[in-house]
Amino acid sequence: MPNPVLLYCLVLLAGMGTSQGENTQSEETCTHFPGGLPHMLRELRAAFGRVKIFFQTKDQLDDMLLSESLLEDFKGYLGCQALSEMIQFYLVEVMPQAENHSPDVKEHVNSLGEKLKTLRLRLRRCHRFLPCENKSKAVQQVKDAFSKLQEKGIYKAMSEFDIFINYIEAYMTAKINS
């Protein structure tokens, strides 16, 4: 039985009209992405480390925003959509507000956002990692809880960014191993 990853990349290349013997950026990204993932996750963790203490000391709430049900969505059939929606949530709703909480963290939050955008771009280039359409109820629960927390939601979401990185890692590890 052929390797499904190899088969998918071949179908992707054929669909793009790639002639035999040419290497495309998508093919390169798809082939090399799994090997570069640990480095990308280290970069995300290092960037978050620059703002972690700021946001975690301001987060005075005991309840978790990023729940176990979200991790289960990441690991299950909704993993693709959950990851895509959570990246969008952090980039559109959380980080722009987080940048405005202190001039000391603005540059670092911006850098963290750029690294997250780079990850999203690389995931999209290799469709194997983000081929999704369904909505995740767990992500909607995170968004609803975030909205209810109002200003405190920024501190909560940013203080749990390391958990989000762990969920990304769990999703990607499952995809790479499947």
UniProtKB/Swiss-Prot annotation:
Q: Which domain of life is it from?
A: Eukaryota
Q: Which cysteines are joined by disulfide bonds?
A: C30-C126, C80-C132
Which UniProt keyword terms apply here? Cytokine, Disulfide bond, Glycoprotein, Secreted, Signal
Query: Which first-to-last residue range defines the signal peptide?
Result: 1-18
Query: Which SMART domains does the entry mention?
Result: IL10
The main location class comes to secreted
Gene Ontology annotations for the cellular component aspect, listed alphabetically: extracellular space
Localization, UniProt: Secreted
- GO:BP terms for this protein? immune response; negative regulation of B cell proliferation; negative regulation of cytokine production involved in immune response; negative regulation of inflammatory response; negative regulation of interleukin-6 production; negative regulation of membrane protein ectodomain proteolysis; positive regulation of B cell apoptotic process; positive regulation of cytokine production
Q: Which GO terms describe its molecular function?
A: cytokine activity
- Residues modified by glycosylation: N134
Q: What does this protein do?
A: Major immune regulatory cytokine that acts on many cells of the immune system where it has profound anti-inflammatory functions, limiting excessive tissue disruption caused by inflammation. Mechanistically, IL10 binds to its heterotetrameric receptor comprising IL10RA and IL10RB leading to JAK1 and STAT2-mediated phosphorylation of STAT3. In turn, STAT3 translocates to the nucleus where it drives expression of anti-inflammatory mediators.
Subunit structure and binding partners = Homodimer. Interacts with IL10RA and IL10RB.
Q: Which family does it belong to?
A: Belongs to the IL-10 family.
Name by which UniProt lists this protein: Interleukin-10
- Provide the species name: Marmota monax (Woodchuck)
Q: Which gene encodes it?
A: IL10
